Regions:
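Conserved beta-propeller blade repeats
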Residues: 93-96, 132-150, 168-188, 218-238, ...
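Beta-propeller blade-edge and WD-like acidic-aromatic loop motif
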Residues: 102, 108-128, 150-165, 184, ...
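Extended, charge-rich low-complexity interaction segments
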Residues: 17-18
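Membrane-interface helical sensory segment of bacterial ECF anti-sigma factor regulators
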Residues: 1-5, 9, 21, 33-108, ...
Length: 373
């Protein structure tokens, strides 16, 4: 197995905004329902949202005294809006502002010799256990209801763990990343005895079926999926040569399988997309005697920028964008420490904030979710 599978660098996920209609004491609050049939909110997320610092959702409009009249008014408004839309074209409502939600991360649990998943507010408060150990290469679904593991899915409360068939045409299927709509997974496929099958495969997230091959490494190495683009058209991944623990950054077209190298001669350990799809962020490979760093680059390889963590760090890796695109979350070991905590900083490397402080624990798999309201 490659080093990628050993350290499980793939916790990527994003929440989708949802809301539920409510009727309380005969009053109707008009709300927008973005996702039908939403899953029950897990206890850890409810605890994070109940904090006084959390943003309070506001109802739209004044409560009406009669539910019947309220429903008639709502129906009339919908008819009027539809009529205007038919005569003047589509109506575009202003997009709701993106609010940064909880940061999720993995923490190594020595007693289990494996990983447990935690969530914490962006200010470092309210840490909650999400899934106890053992869990391998977890990655949260876009709707926040499930976590992909190797190779399967489990609900965020730990129930209904489904393990999928983990082989396909000779390839063992391992760590994965979600498509933006939550329907598909991009999965690493590998076979140390037959490296011709090494590459990335796509599979249904519901049952692991409908498997198709996306990439072929072709150099006896491994293709490791990092992140799916927000528009669902591309998968960013790390391509490593045989026997190497690092690789170069690539992007593959989901429809055609065509892949291009983003940055020649720049090797990395992890790659992810910004939420607007305009940038890739990657960990530059660790080189003995040199400080680690992050890079920002356009998906076509242009506008390459280097971001340096604080000068006193031992090593840093796993950067991921905040939902609003203004900050990066990552794991970093400071000074002579060999165990990492979670930090955030602005995308220019300034305003570094320590989120966790656990000197005896190693933390990784950093992911930053959208506030789900």
């Amino acid at each position: 197995m490659t080093a990628y599978r050993d350290v499980d660098l793939f916790l990527r996920a994003h929440f989708e905004t949802t809301a539920d209609p409510s009727v309380l004491d005969g009053q109707i609050d008009t709300v927008l329902t973005a996702t039908a049939g939403r899953r029950q909110q897990p206890a850890w997320l409810a605890a994070l949202r109940s904090h006084p610092m959390s943003t309070t959702a506001r109802s739209l409009g004044r409560p009406l005294s009669s539910p019947a009249w309220a429903l008639l008014i709502i129906l009339a408004l919908l008819v009027a809006i539809t009529a205007v839309g038919l005569t003047t074209g589509a109506i575009r409502l202003p997009a709701a502002p993106i609010v940064n939600g909880p940061i999720l991360f993995g923490r190594f649990v020595p007693a289990a010799d494996d990983t447990a998943v935690f969530a914490v507010r962006p200010d470092g408060s309210g840490e909650q256990l999400v899934i106890p150990a053992p869990i391998e290469c977890p990655q949260l679904s876009p709707d926040g209801g499930r976590i992909a593991v190797a190779f399967g899915v489990v609900n965020v409360d730990g129930t209904d763990r489904l393990m999928f068939p983990d082989t396909f045409q000779g390839a063992t299927l391992g760590c994965s990343t979600w498509s933006p709509d939550g329907r598909r997974l991009a999965v690493e496929g590998f076979n140390d005895a037959d490296r011709t099958v090494n590459g990335i495969y796509l599979a249904d997230a519901e049952d692991g079926g409908n498997v198709v091959r996306l990439t072929t490494n072709g150099q006896d190495g491994n293709d490791v999926p990092g992140d799916w683009s927000p528009d669902g058209r591309h998968v960013a991944f790390v391509r490593a040569l045989a026997g190497q623990e690092i690789g170069t950054i690539w992007v593959a077209d989901v429809d055609t399988g065509a892949a291009h190298q983003v940055i020649p001669n720049v090797v990395g350990l992890w790659v992810g997309w910004s939420t607007d799809g305009q940038w890739l962020v990657a960990s530059r490979a660790l080189v003995p005697g040199q400080a680690s760093s992050f890079i920002l680059v356009r998906p076509d390889g242009t506008d390459l920028r280097t971001i340096s963590p604080p000068a006193n760090h031992n090593w840093a890796t796993g950067p991921t964008f905040s939902p609003d695109g203004t900050r990066l979350a990552f794991n970093m070991a400071v000074g002579t420490a060999d165990k990492a905590d979670i930090y955030t900083m602005r995308i220019d490397g300034s305003d570094v904030v320590q989120i966790t402080n656990t000197p005896n624990d190693n933390e990784y798999f950093v992911d930053w979710g959208i506030d789900p309201r």
